[in-house]
From Swiss-Prot:
Underlying gene: EIF6-2
Subunit structure and binding partners: Monomer. Associates with the 60S ribosomal subunit.
GO terms under cellular component: cytosol; nucleolus; nucleus
PANTHER family referenced in this protein's UniProt entry, alphabetically: TRANSLATION INITIATION FACTOR 6
Protein's recorded name: Eukaryotic translation initiation factor 6-2
Entry-linked Pfam families: eIF-6
GO biological process: one example: cytosolic ribosome assembly
Molecular-function GO terms, alphabetical: ribosomal large subunit binding; translation initiation factor activity
Subcellular location, principal: cytoplasm
CDD domains: IF6
Species classification: Eukaryota, Viridiplantae, Streptophyta, Embryophyta, Tracheophyta
Subcellular location: Cytoplasm; Nucleus, Nucleolus
Role summary: Binds to the 60S ribosomal subunit and prevents its association with the 40S ribosomal subunit to form the 80S initiation complex in the cytoplasm. May also be involved in ribosome biogenesis.
Keyword check for Cytoplasm: yes
Length: 245
């Protein structure tokens, strides 16, 4: 089930947080309500880490990550990098990237298996994405927008993309990503999907302006009604143990 919340009267919750199946990052300095909303849903299951990136709080737009890794921009300080490495699970690789397009969250949309990337990212960056996140990388646009990370929210169960995405594009993207997709909005009509929400395989957090209709679409496409965190995390633990054995 999706949870509605705000970050200091701001509905762009995907700007101030990053949620994956292995960890959750939240911006430092938000109201306690913001942090406790994440805590009540996630605390028993995955670590919730308060952090800044490059001295800013817009962490969701600056980093990209999944259960395998976390990519942060070159503006990230050594102290922040060390804090993230200390706080995240041991199997999560934290990598700082020397990439000109430093708002990595705007340029990369990914789940645990595939990533959509900005068409102008360096070849080297593309290789790092594939290597650190353990994903197949596709350079794409979404409804003509190059900022794929802004206009797409993705989990292993489904995805939501820019509302003006054509049926042909939806089908093509869905085939690439191997998950069902829907064109939709958050925060009462906002097209910038990833800024207004953050999602993993069992829960989602959306801006408080998100309407009941938008919420039901989110619950439906990401299959949140049937999701159980414990079973998903157990599966992940099994797969991790298998890789170590």
């Amino acid at each position: 089930m999706a949870t509605r919340l705000q970050f200091e009267n701001n509905c762009e919750v995907g700007v101030f947080s990053k949620l994956t199946n292995a960890y959750c990052l939240v911006a430092i300095g938000g109201s306690e309500n913001f942090y406790s909303a994440f805590e009540s849903e996630l605390a028993d299951v995955i670590p919730i880490v308060k952090t800044s990136i490059g001295g800013t709080r817009i962490i969701g737009r600056l980093c990209a990550g999944n259960k395998n890794g976390l990519l942060v921009p070159h503006t990230t300080t050594d102290q922040e990098l060390q804090h993230l490495r200390n706080s995240l699970p041991d199997q999560v690789v934290v990598q700082r990237i020397d990439e000109r397009l430093s708002a990595l969250g705007n340029c990369i949309a990914c789940n645990d298996y595939v990533a959509l990337a900005h068409t102008d990212l360096d070849k080297e960056t593309e290789e790092i994405i594939a290597d650190v996140l353990g994903v197949e990388v596709f350079r794409q646009t979404i409804a003509g927008n190059i900022l794929v990370g802004s206009y797409c929210a993705l989990s292993n169960k489904g995805g939501m993309v820019h509302p003006h995405t054509s049926v042909e594009d939806l089908e093509e993207l869905s085939t690439l990503l191997q998950v069902p997709l829907v064109a939709g909005t958050v925060n009462r009509g906002s097209e910038v999907i990833a800024a207004g929400m953050t999602v993993n395989d069992w829960t989602s957090f959306c801006g408080s302006d998100t309407t009941a209709t938008e919420l039901s679409v989110i619950d439906s496409i990401f299959k949140l009604r049937e999701a159980q965190p414990s079973s998903i995390v157990d599966e992940m633990r099994k797969s991790l143990i298998d890789t170590y054995v």
